[in-house]
């Protein structure tokens, strides 16, 4: 029997460098929510890509960040660091410039013996690729990376080059997931994340970090899926902002989320949304566990 190869590759980096966009591009479909706001990803998400005799399980993680003032931030940091355990490869994503937070992430990686690929993302924003040479020289002096790949997760340029390099590090092993499976997350999780993405995209800078979404109903029928969800905020004033004048903003969130869900599930979706206040949830460990955050 022809051997198969299977392993894990963790995607790591500071917030808002395009880790989730890269995962979606590698999988050729969207499983991880994205927005222009940092720390959009809160949970560890597995994305499974099977190509002939090779299966790579990519681990999308929350952005590692030095600021740990809030309990939710500490939870996300622990999630990101936990993803580095027992993986076969690490994909460290940066933008076309080196920041102090990148150095902080790299310090976390230096304690690990796993091979690290450095990805310089968002090169579609650079007119002359020669501008990257000083950065490549700098990062090469900081760490012995397995490979340095400038690419664009947005356009897909050079993503295949990274993928081929990751394939070479996958150990001989049976597949861990059926070839047709693309994520370990449930339909209910995907529905709640789609709602949160639409909120992140429509709201201002501060409110999204005080938001959480939980489902109170998820019922599949023959021709339709019925979903009811609660959007949790920390303050009464935030509730009004989420709902909007005459309920207009909440209606837009619902419409946008429903359309995405219908693409994901392949059938009609009936979606109901409510907004409720749960004061201090982002700093309360018990409430964080209730909302799906893990140690």
UniProtKB/Swiss-Prot annotation:
Region described as G4: 121-124
Statement: the UniProt record of this protein carries the keyword Cytoplasm: yes
Keywords for this protein: Cell inner membrane, Cell membrane, Cytoplasm, GTP-binding, Membrane, Nucleotide-binding, Ribosome biogenesis, RNA-binding, rRNA-binding
Region (G5): 151-153
Entry's Gene Ontology molecular function annotations: GTP binding; GTPase activity; ribosomal small subunit binding; rRNA binding; small ribosomal subunit rRNA binding
Start and end residues of each stretch annotated as G3: 60-63
Origin superkingdom: Bacteria
InterPro entries xref list: G_ERA_dom, GTP-bd, GTPase_Era-like, KH_dom-like_a/b, KH_dom_type_2, KH_sf_prok-type, P-loop_NTPase, Small_GTP-bd
Region (G2): 39-43
Segments forming domain Era-type G: 5-172
All copies of domain KH type-2, residue ranges: 203-279
GO biological process: ribosomal small subunit assembly
Entry binding sites for GTP: 13-20, 60-64, 121-124
Regions crossing the membrane: none
Subcellular location: Cytoplasm; Cell inner membrane
Keyword Ion transport annotated: no
Broad class of where this protein is predominantly found: cytoplasm
A cellular component annotation (GO) from this entry: cytosol
Region spans: G1: 13-20
Family membership noted in the UniProt record: Belongs to the TRAFAC class TrmE-Era-EngA-EngB-Septin-like GTPase superfamily. Era GTPase family.
Self-association and partners: Monomer.
Protein name according to UniProt: GTPase Era
Source organism of this protein record: Coxiella burnetii (strain RSA 493 / Nine Mile phase I)
Organismal lineage: Bacteria, Pseudomonadati, Pseudomonadota, Gammaproteobacteria, Legionellales
Gene: era
């Amino acid at each position: 029997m022809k051997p198969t190869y299977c392993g894990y590759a963790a995607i790591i980096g500071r917030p808002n460098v395009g880790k989730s966009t890269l995962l979606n591009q590698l999988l050729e479909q969207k499983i991880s929510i994205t927005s222009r706001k940092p720390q959009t990803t809160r949970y560890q998400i597995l994305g499974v890509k099977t190509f002939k005799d090779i299966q790579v399980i990519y681990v999308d993680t929350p952005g590692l960040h030095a600021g740990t003032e809030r309990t939710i931030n500490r939870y996300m940091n622990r999630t990101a660091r936990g993803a580095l355990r027992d993986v076969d490869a690490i994909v460290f994503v940066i933008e076309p410039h080196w920041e102090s937070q990148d150095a902080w992430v790299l310090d976390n990686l230096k304690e690990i013996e796993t091979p690290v690929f450095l990805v310089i993302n968002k090169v579609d924003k650079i007119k002359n690729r020669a501008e990257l040479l000083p950065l490549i020289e700098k990062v090469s002096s900081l760490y012995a990376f397995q490979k340095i790949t400038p690419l664009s997760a947005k356009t897909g340029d050079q993503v295949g080059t990274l993928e081929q390099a990751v394939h070479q590090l996958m150990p001989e092993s049976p597949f861990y997931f059926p070839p047709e499976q693309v994520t370990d997350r449930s339909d209910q999780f995907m529905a709640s994340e789609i709602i949160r993405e639409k909120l992140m995209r429509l709201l201002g800078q501060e409110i999204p970090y005080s938001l959480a979404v939980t489902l109170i109903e998820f019922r599949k029928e023959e021709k339709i899926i019925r979903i009811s969800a609660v959007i949790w905020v920390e303050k009464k004033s935030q509730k009004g902002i989420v709902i909007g004048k005459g309920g207009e903003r909440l209606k837009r969130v619902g419409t946008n989320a429903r359309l995405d869900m219908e693409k994901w599930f392949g059938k009609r979706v009936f979606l109901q949304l409510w907004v409720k206040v749960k004061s201090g949830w982002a700093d309360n460990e018990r409430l964080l566990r209730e909302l799906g955050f893990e140690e």
